[in-house]
Design a protein with these regions (language model features):
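Transmembrane alpha-helix boundary and packing residues in multipass membrane permease domains
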Residues: 25, 29, 41, 78, ...
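Small-residue-rich hydrophobic transmembrane alpha-helices
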Residues: 52-112, 149-168, 262, 276-339, ...
C-alpha cells in the first residue's frame, strides 16, 4: 500500500500522533456543525422565531434517522481500519466494496421509512400545529438526501481509517461555505422558506462527497474496490453488519431517547424549543474537541488492535482521557460567562426568556463535561476494539433514563428537568464503561 502524508498511528510517540490526527477531524467537525448552525442562524434571523422553532422541533428526528446511517458507516469503518492496520490489502478492498453495497441498501431503507412515517411522527411528538408543516418540509428534505450524507461520511471515513484525516477537511470547508451561501441565496433572494435550508445542506454535502471520491481515486486508489472484490463473503458481511448495526443502533437508541425528550420539550412552547435548539448548537461546538479526540482514538485503537499492540492501546486511551478532561474544564469555565451572548448570536433573538433558559442549560450541563468526556472516549475505545455489546448497553441506559425523566421528572420540574436529564444520566453510563474497559484491558495485557 502506498502511504502518502498520512499520520502513522501504530508506532512512534502517541501524543503527537493523536493530536496530528485529531486536529483535522476537529476542523472537519467544526465545519460539519456549520451546516446545521448556519441553518439555525440564517433561519432565525431572516424567517423569525417560528421558523427557528420549526427547525428545532426536527432536530431529534434528524439525529435519529441520519445518525443511524452515519453510525453504521462509522462502525463498518472500524473493520476497514483494522484491515489497514493488519496490512491486508485484499480484505481491505473487499470491506470497502461490501460497505458501499450495505450503505446503498440502508439509504433506500431510511428514505422509505421517512416517506411513510415522518409526518405522523412529528404529530405524535406533539409538534405545535403552528410549525408542524414547516418542520415536515425541512426534515423530509434532509431525509430524502440521506444517501448523499452516507456517501460523504463513508468517503471521509475511508480516508480517516488509513490515517488521512486532512484531505476530507479541505472538501468540507468548501462545502460548508457553499452551504452558507446557498442558505442566504435561497432564503433571502428566492424566498423559498425553511425547506431551502435543507436543500442547501444536501447540495453542499453532495459536492463534498464528489470531491472526496475524486481525491480517493487519484491519491489513494488502493481504497477503491475493483469488480472482482464485489463478491459474497458471508463472514465479512456478518462482521461489517454486526459492527455497523451495533454503532447504528447505539446512535439510534440514543436518538430515540432524544426524540422522547423532544416530545416533552415540545409541550413547553416555542420559546423553550428555540432556547433548546440554540443551547444544543452551542454545546455541539463546545464538545467538538472531545469528539475529535474520540474519533482519533477509535482509528488509533482499530489499527493497533489489528497490529496486536495492546500496551500502546492502554497508553493511547489514558492520553485521550487527559486531553479531553483539560478541554472540558476550560470550556465549562468559558460557557459560564459567555452563554447569554453566544445564545443571542446563534439564535438571532433578543427574547430575554429564550436567552435566560438557553444560558441556564449551558451553565449547568457544562459542569458535567468531564464526565461526558470520559463517556465518549471510553465508548469509542471499546468500539475500536470491536466490542459491540457494551456501548449498546450504555445507550440503553441513556434511553431508559430519558424515559424516566419524561414520565416522572419533567412534568413536575419543567425545563429544569430537561437541563438535568442528560448530565445525570451520563454518570451511570460512564461508570458502566469504566468497569467494562478495565476488565477488557486487563484481559488484553495478560494474554
Amino acid at each position: 500500500m502506498k502511504r502518502i502524508q498520512r499520520v502513522v498511528l501504530i508506532d512512534g510517540p502517541i501524543l503527537p500522533a493523536l493530536l496530528s490526527f485529531a486536529f483535522p477531524i476537529l476542523l472537519s467537525n467544526i465545519f460539519q456543525q456549520l451546516y446545521n448552525t448556519s441553518d439555525v442562524m440564517i433561519v432565525g434571523r431572516f424567517l423569525g422565531q417560528k421558523s427557528l422553532a420549526a427547525v428545532g422541533a426536527t432536530s431529534a428526528i434528524f439525529d435519529l434517522i441520519v445518525g443511524f446511517a452515519v453510525g453504521v458507516g462509522n462502525g463498518m469503518g472500524i473493520i476497514i481500519a483494522r484491515n489497514y492496520g493488519a496490512k491486508n490489502e485484499d480484505q481491505l478492498r473487499k470491506s470497502v466494496a461490501a460497505t458501499a453495497i450495505i450503505g446503498c441498501i440502508l439509504s433506500l431503507f431510511v428514505i422509505f421509512i421517512g416517506a411513510v412515517g415522518l409526518f405522523p411522527l412529528l404529530q405524535f411528538l406533539g409538534t405545535p400545529s403552528a410549525i408542524v408543516s414547516q418542520s415536515y418540509l425541512y426534515i423530509a428534505t434532509i431525509v430524502n438526501g440521506v444517501a448523499v450524507t452516507f456517501a460523504y461520511n463513508l468517503c471521509a471515513g475511508l480516508l480517516r481509517a488509513v490515517g488521512d484525516s486532512l484531505a476530507a477537511l479541505y472538501f468540507l470547508i468548501i462545502a460548508a461555505i457553499l452551504n452558507i451561501l446557498l442558505d442566504l441565496y435561497f432564503i433571502t433572494q428566492l424566498h423559498l422558506g425553511v425547506q431551502s435550508a435543507g436543500i442547501a445542506t444536501i447540495i453542499a454535502q453532495g459536492i463534498s462527497a464528489l470531491l472526496c471520491i475524486f481525491y480517493i481515486r487519484k491519491k489513494v486508489p488502493f481504497l477503491l474496490p475493483h469488480r472482482k472484490v464485489f463478491v459474497w463473503d458471508k463472514e465479512l458481511y456478518q462482521d461489517l453488519l454486526s459492527q455497523g448495526l451495533a454503532m447504528g443502533l447505539m446512535t439510534s437508541i440514543v436518538s430515540i431517547g432524544t426524540v422522547i425528550l423532544q416530545s416533552a420539550i415540545n409541550q413547553l412552547g416555542t420559546t423553550i424549543i428555540s432556547a433548546q435548539v440554540a443551547a444544543r448548537r452551542i454545546m455541539s461546538f463546545a464538545v467538538l474537541p472531545i469528539t475529535a479526540i474520540a474519533s482519533s482514538i477509535t482509528t488509533f485503537i482499530s489499527q493497533n488492535f489489528g497490529a496486536e499492540q495492546f500496551q500502546r492501546i492502554k497508553k493511547g486511551v489514558t492520553i485521550a482521557n487527559l486531553l479531553s478532561w483539560v478541554w472540558s474544564v476550560l470550556v465549562a469555565a468559558l460557557l459560564f460567562f459567555t452563554s447569554p451572548s453566544l445564545t443571542s448570536f446563534i439564535s438571532g433573538s433578543t427574547n430575554p426568556d429564550l436567552i435566560a433558559n438557553a444560558s441556564l442549560y449551558l451553565q449547568i450541563s457544562s459542569c458535567f463535561y468531564p464526565i461526558l468526556a470520559s463517556l465518549i472516549i471510553l465508548r469509542n475505545a471499546l468500539q475500536g476494539m470491536g466490542k459491540k455489546l457494551t456501548p449498546l448497553t450504555s445507550s440503553f441506559i441513556e434511553l431508559f433514563g430519558k424515559i424516566f425523566f419524561v414520565l416522572w421528572i419533567i412534568p413536575h420540574t419543567g425545563y429544569m428537568g430537561v437541563i438535568l436529564c442528560e448530565p445525570l444520566i451520563w454518570i451511570p453510563m460512564t461508570l458502566q464503561l469504566i468497569i467494562i474497559y478495565r476488565k477488557i484491558r486487563y484481559q488484553l495485557l495478560t494474554e
